């Protein structure tokens, strides 16, 4: 019950933050949708945070213009590094896939910010 309350509070804070109301970018919208999906998956705060990170990465990739181009370049590099790290960790193809997803999302967010 406590984890669910914390997760709902986290999503609420994201949804009603000043940045999300002022002019939500695709990255912000993706983070909100991902956080909501993570909450609905029943994994508590961990699911909310993972969902928000992946959603923000997908949102950053779909941005238009220069920010989107930089996000896509960052996602490519991040996915490559993540896949290699996943294989080297000894988890085989499953580790490579997880590493590519997480690395791609992180790389997209960082690429968009730069």
From Swiss-Prot:
Record Pfam families: Gly-zipper_OmpA
Domain of life of the native organism: Bacteria
Assigned protein family: Belongs to the UPF0757 family.
Protein name (database record): UPF0757 protein YmgG
């Amino acid at each position: 019950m406590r984890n669910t309350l914390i997760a709902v509070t986290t999503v609420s804070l994201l949804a009603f933050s000043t940045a999300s109301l002022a002019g939500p970018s695709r990255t912000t919208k993706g983070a909100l949708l991902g956080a909501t999906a993570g909450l609905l998956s029943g994994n508590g705060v961990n699911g909310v945070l993972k969902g928000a990170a992946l959603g923000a990465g997908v949102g950053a990739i779909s941005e238009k213009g220069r920010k989107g181009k930089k996000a896509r370049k960052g996602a490519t590099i991040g996915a490559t590094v993540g896949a290699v790290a996943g294989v080297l960790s000894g988890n085989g193809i499953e580790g490579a896939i997880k590493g590519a997803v997480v690395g791609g999302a992180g790389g997209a967010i960082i690429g968009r910010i730069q």
